[in-house]
């Protein structure tokens, strides 16, 4: 009986002792928490997972503590804000204790740590459960390298801007990255200007939907192998390779672009590309090609015969500054939904042959600078162009200095308000018949025909100019033009006639007898250099508001 009682007592004591011993251990385990300490004096930030938070003497943040940006975005409390960035911390340390913590997100953890140069103990960052790495190293300007070889990324879905603006990074080893679940790679390497190479051969991009600006301004990259990229689910490739000026070739033969809607600026500024094969691109869902090939200054040819542009609405600057492109056949282009053709072929300086026979321009509202400075074009047949919605033709043919033939016979200009410099420096054009132009809504005709030195025939007698305010330099240096019929011009709202006929060297007669000049303030150099004019009728001129008549008749030797 005594032995039984003794055993029972011992057992109870043993259980009690175990419970009493376990209790503080459980309390200890429960009190562990993840947090960050900033030591401003030492310029170090340390990540811990322990129960010593209260004893830390630096600035301490709980791992889930947040701050709001001006836009309302919640980011870690220790992150750099959008205005100033974090300009103190030069070193980040992951304490060994932190390896037992499993974060589910590391988004914005080091965002805008602009002077951060070292990450120590990063192997203690356990990323097994992380799903979001968005903006993790965003704007870490001074970071020269980062070892991510231990990163487990198999659960990550978001890598948006992960290394964006890490301008000092010269190399990046992502060979261990598992990206099979990633859907967002938007701006992932944006502005990584120091990277000269990037091996992404192991990347699984099957689920990626967004590749917008992925390599934006990676100016140091000289090569990029994307032959294994699966892009079947990608919808956005806008500015994907923008200003990757060091890349000389791109193999995109495996790209599936069937779901892509945005190709805006996709290759813009790729000035090193000498060739580009996009013949297999499926563009049936693309709505914007704004600046798609702009400033591809080394491209000499481009085959777009397979492009389906039926849904495209924006072709603004699509080929602008393709300064080595000699010929372009866009006969297959369907432009029925395009509304913007601003600067579409601007500064294609050696483009001698351009085929646009089937362009439907009935929805286009802007043709501003569309062919500006296309200096090699000698003829342009735009007879298919119907322009009922166009409001601006400013500088449309400006600088087309080799143009001798221009067919714009079907232009509808009823809604055009701006013809500023429309034919500026079309110095080889011998004649222009604009008798069909409806200019009722035009307010600006500044330098409209300036430097059209070869013009010998110009039909503008039907122009309705009642709303025009600026006619300065309108016929400046039309040095071969013998006469002008402006008898129908209504100038009641014109305020500026400065240099309007300056250097019309062959002009013998200009009928300005019906000009209403009561609102004109500037007549500086208006007839300067009109050396063959013998008479001018100013009987209706009202110069009460004119403040400048300097050199108005300079070198008018025959008057």
Predicted regions: what they are:
Residues 107, 134-135, 160-161, 186-187, ...:
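Register-specific detector for alpha-helical tandem repeat solenoids, activating on a conserved position
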Residues 2-128, 334, 356-360, 384, ...:
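N-terminal capping/linker segments that flank leucine-rich repeat
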Residues 88-101, 115-131, 141-157, 167-183, ...:
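Structural signature of tandem-repeat unit edges
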């Amino acid at each position: 009986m005594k032995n039984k009682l003794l055993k029972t007592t011992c057992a109870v004591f043993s259980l009690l002792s175990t419970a009493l011993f376990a209790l503080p251990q459980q309390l200890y385990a429960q009190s562990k928490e993840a947090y960050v300490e900033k030591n401003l004096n030492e310029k170090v930030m340390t990540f811990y997972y322990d129960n010593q938070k209260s004893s830390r003497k630096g600035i301490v943040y709980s791992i889930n503590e947040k701050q709001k940006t001006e836009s309302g975005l919640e980011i870690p409390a220790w992150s750099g804000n959008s205005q100033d960035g974090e300009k103190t911390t030069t070193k980040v340390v992951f304490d060994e204790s932190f390896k037992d913590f499993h974060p589910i997100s590391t988004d914005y953890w080091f965002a805008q740590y602009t002077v951060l140069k070292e990450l120590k103990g990063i192997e203690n960052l356990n990323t097994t459960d992380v799903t979001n790495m968005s903006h993790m190293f965003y704007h870490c300007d001074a970071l020269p390298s980062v070892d991510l070889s231990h990163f487990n990324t198999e659960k990550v879905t978001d890598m948006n801007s992960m290394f964006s603006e890490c301008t000092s990074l010269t190399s990046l080893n992502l060979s261990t990255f598992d990206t099979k679940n990633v859907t967002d790679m938007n701006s992932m390497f944006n502005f990584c200007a120091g990277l000269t190479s990037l091996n992404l051969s192991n990347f699984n991009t099957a689920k990626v939907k967004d590749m917008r600006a992925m390599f934006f301004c990676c100016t140091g990259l000289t090569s990029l192998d994307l032959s294994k990229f699966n892009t079947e689910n990608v919808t956005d490739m806008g500015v994907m390779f923008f200003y990757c000026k060091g890349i000389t070739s791109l193999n995109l033969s495996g790209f599936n672009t069937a779901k892509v809607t945005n190709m805006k600026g996709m290759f813009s500024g790729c000035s090193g590309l000498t060739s580009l094969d996009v013949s297999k691109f499926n563009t049936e869902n693309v709505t914007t090609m704004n600046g798609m090939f702009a400033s591809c200054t080394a491209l000499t040819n481009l085959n777009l015969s397979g492009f389906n542009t039926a849904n495209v609405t924006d072709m603004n600057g699509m080929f602008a500054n393709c300064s080595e492109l000699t010929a372009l056949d866009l006969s297959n282009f369907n432009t029925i939904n395009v509304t913007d053709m601003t600067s579409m072929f601007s500064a294609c300086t050696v483009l001698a042959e351009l085929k646009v026979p089937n362009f439907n321009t009935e929805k286009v509202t802007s043709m501003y600078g569309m062919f500006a400075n296309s200096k090699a074009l000698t003829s342009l047949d735009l007879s298919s162009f119907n322009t009922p919605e166009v409001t601006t033709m400013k500088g449309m043919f400006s600088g087309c200095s080799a143009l001798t033939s221009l067919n714009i016979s079907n232009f509808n200009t009823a809604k055009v308000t701006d013809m500023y410099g429309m034919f500026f420096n079309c110095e080889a054009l011998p004649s222009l018949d604009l008798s069909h132009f409806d200019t009722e809504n035009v307010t600006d005709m500044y330098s409209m025909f300036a430097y059209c030195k070869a013009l010998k025939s110009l039909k503008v007698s039907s122009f309705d100019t009642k709303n025009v305010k600026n006619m300065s330099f309108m016929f400046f240096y039309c040095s071969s033009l013998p006469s002008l019929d402006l008898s129908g011009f209504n100038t009641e709202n014109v305020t500026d006639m400065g240099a309007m006929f300056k250097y019309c060297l062959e002009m013998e007669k200009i009928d300005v007898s019906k000009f209403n000049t009561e609102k004109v303030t500037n007549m500086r150099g208006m007839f300067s250099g009109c050396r063959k004019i013998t008479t001018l009728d100013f009987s209706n001129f009202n110069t009460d508001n004119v403040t400048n008549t300097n050199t108005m008749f300079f070198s008018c030797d025959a008057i």
